[in-house]
Amino acid sequence: MKTNGEEDSRHIFRGELALVIAVMINSLAVILMLYSGSGISAISSVPYAFEKVFPVITLGTWTYIFQALLILSLMILRKKFVPIYLCSFFVGFAFSELLDVNEAWINVLPKTIPLRVLYFVISYLLICVGIALSNRCGLPIIPTDLFPRELSEIIKVKYSKIKVSFDVICLGTTACMTGLILGHIKGLGIGTILAAFTMGKGIAITG
């Protein structure tokens, strides 16, 4: 007969495994979507814009700087220090490092038009699955996934609405930054826009 301790240990292990898989899936999906030529995913569009404007720092580094600001914003909204948010930042750091790892090898993939479409579809589905896994694992998750979930709880608005709004704001910021500073919009494509307006519901269906 299983004890409560054994059941708790199994639950924690499953949560940890789900989180590891989610981080690996999301980091690959973000780079794959960008490689497809359809644009960067909304959750990484702001760090991507900073990388293009200030290329001395990698996408991964800009990502955890952005994530730190999201964590700080949540603590300000909560009006207190939340230890689990700090844990989330360390998970985000691992995600950021994996972005740079995946960016280093992704060019080995062939880049025909049919394959680009396939890469986008795969990356879209992977992000939906990855975020749904993160939300259900019961452990600290990547700050870009944590932010809309926590904001939804703080201001009492449905998660899917917050997620779509967050993505659209990220895309608007990216468009303004690259358009005004570089003279042309970088990183935003039809896939980015489609994902931003539908991914909230996609995650809800997947989760």
Sequence positions of predicted segments:
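Core subunits and conserved enzymes of cellular information-processing
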Residues: K2-G207
